Amino acid sequence: AKHVDALLDGLRFDAKERPRLVHRLDKDTSGVLLLARSAKSAAMLGEAFRSKEARKVYWAIVAGVPRPAMGRIDLSLEKRPGRGGEKMAADEEGKRAITDYKIVANAARRASWLVLEPVTGRTHQLRVHCQAIGTPILGDGKYGGKDAFIEGDSPISRNLHLHARGIQIPNPGGGMLEVIAPLPEHMVKTWRYFEFDERDEAEPFLEWRE
């Protein structure tokens, strides 16, 4: 698939300026991606993220059940060379990375549906943080290895089960604008397999965060 940057000219429509990416998603992550139609709006949205006024929330299926059921992962990350390319790794001398999470549902001890809200925006942050607490995201062989896959006769896709579910940004007209993205097909099938119900998480943003 073409990188998103290569598609931006096609999203210009009648605007004089080329759209700008406000943030990025990992190559295999689905969901909401925010574009700015002008340099001015890009600057405003960038500041909204820096000030934590704008928020992003992700859904993931992880292998196992994290403990506690709700918490904050505060683990600094650093980029390191590795087999198959560079990887992010926990490193006290790295850049601070913080993720809030909570369990929505779990399938015994096999897997859990998590809501993840990154407080910082480091590369591969959610993937490394989930692996660091012993529950790698399903399909994330890069960080979870074989533990990121449910073996046997399971029909679960081997694709990454990480989805940018929603984004919340200031509305220039007042209040907040919230955009929700539907799950991709492979994750819909996994939800059905585990008998999870999307309606169980009616409020996608974590309101318990300090």
Please provide the spans of the model-predicted regions:
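Short acidic/polar mixed-charge low-complexity motifs
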Residues: 95-97, 122, 134, 173-177
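Pseudouridine synthase
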Residues: 1-8, 39, 79, 105-168
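RNA pseudouridine synthases
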Residues: 1-87, 92-95, 105-108, 151, ...
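Broad gene-expression machinery/nucleic-acid interaction feature
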Residues: 31, 57, 72, 98, ...
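Internal, well-ordered alpha-helical scaffold/interface segments
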Residues: 43, 75, 99-102, 124, ...
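Short, acidic, Ser/Thr-enriched surface-loop or helix-capping motifs
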Residues: 91, 118, 171-172
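Conserved hydrophobic positions within beta-strands
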Residues: 62, 100-103, 137
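Residue-level signal for inorganic ion chemistry
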Residues: 34, 60, 101, 126, ...
